[in-house]
């Protein structure tokens, strides 16, 4: 995981960089972020066009392509390392009106009542507005558990 920013209440946002980290997040939060991470990873690797046809040089640039192409997956952690919320932001953390930002708590519950200040801080870091009505997919409905 990669440190992104500190948040109020002794909380920290980290970027989920690998499928293994996504699997741990899914287990800790009892939701399906691993599935979405894997789908995004596969789509990004599938869209990669190497600059060279040489076998040896084929994958140079793949990692940076993946980081530019796939959504940013993040986890909010407390000081003990406990998972509090999971976020999926547009590729590069840049505004994209076509992209549905998702922020959920454990078991896809609403993270805003307990972590709104931390979510706001993440939005400030990326220059995004992360309002509940836009980012919590189950507002006004019962969450899907997986």
Task: For every predicted segment, state its role.
Residues 1-146:
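Catalytic-core elements of nucleic-acid end-processing and repair enzymes
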